[in-house]
Amino acid sequence: STPIKSSAASDVYKRQSLKRKGIEIRLNAYALSVYDTADGITLTYTDNSDNTPYFWEGDALLLATGRRPMTDGLNLHAAGIRTDTRGALIVNEHLQTTAPHIWAMGDVRGGALYDYLSLDDFRIITNRLFGNKKRKTDDRIPVPYVIFTDPPLAHIGMTEEEAVKRGYSLQVSRLPAAAIPRARTLQQIDGMMKAIVNAHTGRIIGCTLFCIDAPEVINLVSLAMKNDLHYSILRDFIFTHPSMSEGLNDLFKAF
């Protein structure tokens, strides 16, 4: 799977939004034990900063353990198919396995486990078998992702911290969701938009949207990035009003 990227600025907005909904986040926590009670469960954990034990009572406990391909017992090695340590089939940029006549698509090939990538896997393999054989996995980078929280979180490209580490000269813009008319008409003013632009080329390096309609708006940023468009295209684009998309006008106006 792909690790969730974030940044200090968007983290502040996310924590504030969750806190208003009565959701508390405990960081640096290490679970020690959990047991049933008459009313639900009790979790014992420690704070890694000082090893102080804490007790948390709740109705239920959700374990987010991730997913892995169910390839055990398929005897894939007999067909010449190699797997990685998690059981995912090892593939090349055309999704061809180590057995030249076998391809893999979807979660079984590991990597980012998104439905929309599985659909693109189909396009790549179809192109390889019946097309010009040019389509490959590198063509779809960068890939956006969405977490359907309330408000939803969408991201594409690098975070500000990643871009700084790679030596980019940056311009960064932030826009509170409350500044977008559509967010006010929907009474969904929590969150923010953030964009990172290469100061020398004007190309968009990354974008984080933590606001209503983020899953839709991120696709416009993705389209601009994949086509190597200058940020001014989104800055000057005529969007419908009122819509969350027109927030991109103001977000990129700051550069």
Predicted regions located by residue number:
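Single conserved hydrophobic/aromatic residue that forms the stacking wall/gate
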Residues: S1-A9, Y13
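N-terminal glycine-rich dinucleotide-binding loop that anchors FAD/FMN and/or NAD(P) in oxidoreductases
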Residues: S10-A29
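Conserved beta-strand-loop-beta-strand element in the redox core of flavoprotein oxidoreductases
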Residues: D36-F55, L61
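FAD-site-proximal beta/loop scaffold in flavoenzymes
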Residues: F55-N132, E216
